[in-house]
Regions:
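Histidine-centered nuclease catalytic patch
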Residues: 1, 373-377
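Secondary-structure transition/capping motifs at alpha-helix termini
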Residues: 7-12, 129-133, 267-271, 289, ...
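Short, compositionally biased pre-sequence/patch detector
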Residues: 364-365
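Glycine- and hydrophobic-rich flexible loops that cap the catalytic core of alpha/beta enzyme folds
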Residues: 2-189
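Generic recognition of flexible, low-complexity loop/linker segments
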Residues: 95-98, 108-110, 245-251, 369-374
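A cross-family structural signal marking well-folded subdomains
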Residues: 89, 107, 128, 136-360
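Conserved long hydrophobic alpha-helices within structured protein cores
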Residues: 1-2, 194
Length: 377
């Protein structure tokens, strides 16, 4: 707000803004008698602090170098600038009058605590009565409250890595957190607005209180696998035909199968691939018979822990029969009735591509025998 005000004054030809400069930064003298420039506000993350210093010094880094935190600060700066331009246009007197009101009438309360954990607790309480925080914000605060001071830097870096990776991939952090909990802890029904209360009640089960940094490492490992799965790759980033086929069928909107894949990500690849193929077949049966994919929100969490305990294909067969195959059999009669009269123009583009690819593969197998089990398109 202050940087935008100062820069708006300058854009209107005003050069007298020493009072604003003094609020933004201060000059200090070090032990060698040298004057040093210090921004008054010290941000938690280095990248955000770098941008704030750039705003104060009028040396903003190139946009291509911005992180998500830096972009958020610039969005706030641009919003403030747009407000000044809209409300006061070129009227310097009115603009200065607003600044006078802001500085002299708006009171900022500074709360000092004896520890960061206590500060975070107060922050959580204040925001419970004001700005709403989602489960990710609250979880971050909770982890810092549980961590030793020596862990703060490690925790800060790990958390930023997690959130940035999800945002950079266009993935909603809350959805990932919900799917992670459903996949890992045997929960079968949990809404996004229930995540934080669930975590508080299950501290011992999850283990974040005893090892906050370790829990963030686990989240990062799961998020890396999750994002690779969304791209049709194995959790170590390698091409995976069975996963690619599922993702081609699922498109960008359907993600419930990620609950299963997160739960079984450490199984032997033969078992993991078999689960992928069964998930693909069930999804296709749902597509042909017009079933709502939201049913997977019920089925997959219910199956996740059972599937995660399987180590061999032999052990998987009876489980597959009582889960995926059982549900497919329930749809069998309708599937055989609907598939012959299915219209391609009734499908979305990505579903059309999937269907054509699978039909082409079936023709190749019928005409030439064994074909490559690689890509299905």
């Amino acid at each position: 707000i202050l940087c935008a005000y100062r820069d708006r004054l300058q854009a209107l030809g005003e050069t007298q803004h020493a009072a604003v400069d003094a609020l933004l930064a201060t000059q200090k003298v070090d032990d060698l008698g040298r004057e040093t420039f210090e921004v008054r506000l010290d941000l938690q993350y280095q990248d955000a602090g770098k941008l704030l210093t750039g705003l104060v010094e009028r040396k903003v880094p190139e946009p291509k170098t911005w992180t998500r935190s830096m972009a958020n600060i610039m969005t706030a700066y641009d919003t403030a600038t747009a407000f000044y331009e809209k409300e006061f246009k070129d009227d310097v007197a009115d603009l200065r009058k607003f600044f006078g009101y802001l500085i002299n009438r708006v009171k900022l309360i500074r709360v000092k605590t004896d520890s960061l954990a206590r500060a975070l607790k107060i922050f959580e309480t204040i925001n419970d009565r004001g700005v709403g925080l989602d489960a990710m914000d609250l979880l971050k605060n909770l982890l810092f409250m549980k961590a030793d001071k020596a862990e703060f830097q490690t925790l800060k870096v790990g958390w930023k890595k997690l959130v940035d990776a999800l945002h950079d991939a266009g993935e909603k952090p809350l959805r990932f957190l919900r799917y992670f909990i459903l996949s890992a802890y045997g929960e079968q029904k949990l809404r996004e607005d229930e995540l934080y209360s669930w975590l508080v009640k299950n501290e011992e089960k999850v283990g974040y209180g005893a090892d906050p940094a370790g829990f963030v490492d686990t989240l990062n490992e799961a998020a890396n696998a999750y994002l690779n799965f969304m791209s049709g790759r194995s959790q170590d980033g390698k091409p995976h035909p069975a996963l690619e086929a599922v993702q081609l069928l699922a498109g960008k909107a359907t993600r419930q199968h990620m609950i299963l894949f997160l739960a079984v990500r450490d199984l032997p690849d033969q078992v993991f691939s078999a689960i992928c193929r069964d998930a693909e077949n069930l999804m296709f049966a749902f597509l042909v018979t017009g079933q709502n994919f939201r049913e997977f929100e019920v089925l997959f969490p219910a199956w996740a822990q059972r599937l995660a305990s399987i180590k061999t294909l032999e052990a998987y067969e009876p489980v597959s029969a009582s889960t995926f195959n059982k549900r497919r059999q329930e749809l069998s009669e309708r599937f055989h009735r609907e598939f012959p009269v299915m219209r391609v123009d009734g499908l979305r583009k990505f579903q059309q591509r999937y269907l054509v690819a699978r039909l082409t593969q079936a023709v190749d197998q019928a005409g030439f025998g064994s074909t490559s089990q690689g890509h299905v398109w």
